[in-house]
Structure formats: structure tokens, C-alpha cells
Curated annotation (Swiss-Prot):
It is an enzyme of class 7 (translocase). This is NAD(P)H-quinone oxidoreductase subunit J, chloroplastic. It comes from Populus trichocarpa (Western balsam poplar). PANTHER family: NADH DEHYDROGENASE [UBIQUINONE] IRON-SULFUR PROTEIN 3, MITOCHONDRIAL, NADH DEHYDROGENASE UBIQUINONE IRON-SULFUR PROTEIN 3. One of its GO terms (biological process) is photosynthesis, light reaction. Its EC number is 7.1.1.-. It is found in: Plastid, Chloroplast thylakoid membrane.
Length: 159
């Protein structure tokens, strides 16, 4: 089932895949990494002026990595429930690269850095893409399903 935003994107020739609606009735769309930056700018101009959250997850061991964006359209003076959309961008595990939306929504800064730190997704054109939670010397991506955690003594000896 296609939602209003998906219908608008189709009308304007913007490539995406509708994933239906989540349990709260929020429209969910899949965007290809190569199309994400231009569609992000279009969504901002369309009125999605607030990045509520960005997160990432490992779809399956050895599979794709996903970067999720929850966008809200806040209109001043409108007290009703704001319009929301969930965007999913999937990247290959081997070289996961997704355009950063830092220059569209500044709130993506720490959120994209955390996704990089935990899953190794590289956000192209991010101004400060470096580890934010783990030490710079940390090897690997702790939230990947195929990550092998070092035992306690290895961590203790490293410091």
C-alpha cells in the first residue's frame, strides 16, 4: 500500500520503494544509497524539517546494513499530529557507504557518528566522521552480528 509521500515521489519521478506503514501508521520508504542525498534535500524542501532520530542495524549475519531516518514535518501554528516518515537506506556489508545528511539536518551529526562507530557505515561528506563511543584504537564494529567480542583480559591488557 502506497502512502501520500510515496505517491508524491512517484508523481515527481523520484525512485524509491514503498515498504507500507509501521504499527503506528507511519509511512516507511526504502531509498537507494546513490539517491539518498538528493531525496533528503527534496524531503527537507517538502517540509520534513526535523530529523527525529537516525539509527542503524545489521539486517542479518553477512547481509546488508541498514541506516534508518525518522523525519518529522513540523509546521508552526499547527497543533495536530505532525506528519512523519521513516526512511530506510540499505548498504552492502563489504563497503557500506551512504551519503551523510549532516548538511541537510544538523542533528544527524552524532547519530551518524554512532552508526559509524558501532556498525562501520561510512557516511560520505560527514565533517567529523570518527569514533564517538569506542576508543579510536578499537578494532571492528561491535553491533554487527558477525562481530567476535574480545574477552575481558584482552581489553584489560590493551589499556
Amino acid at each position: 500500500m502506497r502512502g501520500p509521500l510515496s505517491a508524491w515521489l512517484v508523481k515527481h519521478g523520484l525512485v524509491h520503494r514503498s515498504l507500507g506503514f509501521d504499527y503506528q501508521g507511519i509511512e516507511t520508504l526504502q531509498i537507494k544509497p546513490e539517491d539518498w542525498h538528493s531525496i533528503a534535500v527534496i524531503l527537507y524542501v517538502y517540509g520534513y524539517n526535523y530529523l527525529r532520530s537516525q539509527c542503524a542495524y545489521d539486517v542479518a549475519p553477512g547481509g546488508l546494513l541498514a541506516s534508518i531516518y525518522h523525519l518529522t514535518r513540523i509546521e508552526y501554528g499547527i497543533l495536530d499530529q505532525p506528519e512523519e516518515v521513516c526512511i530506510k537506506v540499505f548498504a552492502p556489508r563489504k563497503n557500506p557507504r551512504i551519503p551523510s545528511v549532516f548538511w541537510v539536518w544538523k542533528s544527524a551529526d552524532f547519530q551518524e557518528r554512532e552508526s559509524y562507530d558501532m556498525l562501520g557505515i561510512s557516511y560520505d561528506n560527514h565533517p567529523r566522521l570518527k569514533r564517538i563511543l569506542m576508543p579510536e584504537s578499537w578494532i571492528g564494529w561491535p553491533l554487527r552480528k558477525d562481530y567476535i567480542a574480545p574477552n575481558f583480559y584482552e581489553i584489560q591488557d590493551a589499556h
